[in-house]
Amino acid sequence: MTAIIERRENSSLWARFCEWITSTENRLYIGWFGVLMVPTLLTATTVFIIGFIAAPPVDIDGIREPVSGSLLYGNNIISGAIVPTSNAIGLHFYPIWEAASVDEWLYNGGPYQMIVCHFFIGVCSYMGREWELSFRLGMRPWIAVAYSAPVAAATAVFIIYPIGQGSFSDGMPLGISGTFNFMIVFQAEHNILMHPFHMLGVAGVFGGSLFSAMHGSLVTSSLIRQTTENESTNNGYVFGQEEETYNIVAAHGYFGRLIFQYASFNNSRSLHFFLAAWPVIGIWFTAMGISTMAFNLNGFNFNQSIIDSQGRVINSWADIINRANLGMEVMHERNAHNFPLDLA
């Protein structure tokens, strides 16, 4: 048998570029989604940093009452934010070239829309990049599926909610105090605390924290010691070792006796799927709740639903929450309303 070896022809520049982009040997995987992710996230990050430091006040309500958000205009890390695009712009696409000047663009909050749009494309591309790398390594796609939960949450507050309310000025400000303001106003207008999807999200986040702490503490408490008493147990682990690093039987037995037998997983794969699925599904529900409340399908209203035999109202906690909602509602954007309550 004769083997014929031919010298490989020099590949084109484009072919070498494609090979480099999709190579899993790079220190950081780029991928085709990364080609879109890198410039969009760099743009969003750069504009955010510059805007947080130096952006002038923004006329968020469209009534010529600008709100300051940057450090150079009197804010600190906690009170500072990228102020949302003006209500005068609404949902219009507002790039720099649509404004008469850069000053007008800044006054109307153009940077917020620029950051949010690039950030949205960037995080979606990051999710796609996770799937792409998993595919090339022969892994299952669940990492990208799990990441879809925070992507859905960000999409809900930055994209879906402004669309439903008719203006980017209703989007979540990009700052700490601005986020709190968004939460308070959202409760006032939509009664989110009484929405079952938000309740499921709370169960997902708090439950996920509890399960993570339980799992971590159980594993840490049942490590198989490979070191002396005078050395850290952690030093007994060798990266890539084939044998188990902890005794799952001991952990299962402990937890089964602490609660009851069937509360403890005896399958490591089922356990880790549960740890991933619980918070992800909870955050999915919260994102769906925000997206439905965006179109004013609000939380439950049990106001004045309990009355005595004489027809007098017996207040429940729902009525107390409603009273708080009314107070928050009439106090926010107090110069923008012609009526005590939004007609929506």
Swiss-Prot record:
* Keywords of the record: Calcium, Chlorophyll, Chloroplast, Chromophore, Electron transport, Herbicide resistance, Iron, Magnesium, Manganese, Membrane, Metal-binding, Oxidoreductase, Photosynthesis, Photosystem II, Plastid, Thylakoid, Transmembrane, Transmembrane helix, Transport
Quote the record's binding site residues for pheophytin a.
Answer: Y126
Which residue ranges traverse the bilayer? 29-46, 118-133, 142-156, 197-218, 274-288
Name the site position(s) for Tyrosine radical intermediate: Y161
EC assignment = 1.10.3.9
Query: How does the UniProt record describe the way this protein sits in the membrane?
Result: Multi-pass membrane protein
A GO BP entry: response to herbicide
Please list the coiled coil stretches: none
Q: Pfam families attached here?
A: Photo_RC
Q: Where does chlorophyll a PD1 bind?
A: H198
Tree of life domain = Eukaryota
Residue positions annotated to bind [CaMn4O5] cluster are: D170, E189, H332, E333, D342, A344
Q: Positions of the site: Stabilizes free radical intermediate?
A: H190
Where does it mainly reside? plastid
Task: Enumerate the catalysed reactions.
Answer: 2 a plastoquinone + 4 hnu + 2 H2O = 2 a plastoquinol + O2
Q: How is it modified after translation?
A: Tyr-161 forms a radical intermediate that is referred to as redox-active TyrZ, YZ or Y-Z.
Q: Where in the cell is it found?
A: Plastid, Chloroplast thylakoid membrane
Q: Which residues bind a quinone?
A: H215, S264, F265
One Gene Ontology cellular component:
photosystem II
Signal sequence extent: none
Relay the cofactor remark from the entry. The D1/D2 heterodimer binds P680, chlorophylls that are the primary electron donor of PSII, and subsequent electron acceptors. It shares a non-heme iron and each subunit binds pheophytin, quinone, additional chlorophylls, carotenoids and lipids. D1 provides most of the ligands for the Mn4-Ca-O5 cluster of the oxygen-evolving complex (OEC). There is also a Cl(-1) ion associated with D1 and D2, which is required for oxygen evolution. The PSII complex binds additional chlorophylls, carotenoids and specific lipids.
Q: How does it assemble?
A: PSII is composed of 1 copy each of membrane proteins PsbA, PsbB, PsbC, PsbD, PsbE, PsbF, PsbH, PsbI, PsbJ, PsbK, PsbL, PsbM, PsbT, PsbY, PsbZ, Psb30/Ycf12, at least 3 peripheral proteins of the oxygen-evolving complex and a large number of cofactors. It forms dimeric complexes.
Q: Its family?
A: Belongs to the reaction center PufL/M/PsbA/D family.
Its biological purpose: Photosystem II (PSII) is a light-driven water:plastoquinone oxidoreductase that uses light energy to abstract electrons from H(2)O, generating O(2) and a proton gradient subsequently used for ATP formation. It consists of a core antenna complex that captures photons, and an electron transfer chain that converts photonic excitation into a charge separation. The D1/D2 (PsbA/PsbD) reaction center heterodimer binds P680, the primary electron donor of PSII as well as several subsequent electron acceptors.
Q: What other note does the entry give for this protein?
A: 2 of the reaction center chlorophylls (ChlD1 and ChlD2) are entirely coordinated by water. Herbicides such as atrazine, BNT, diuron or ioxynil bind in the Q(B) binding site and block subsequent electron transfer.
Q: What is this protein called?
A: Photosystem II protein D1
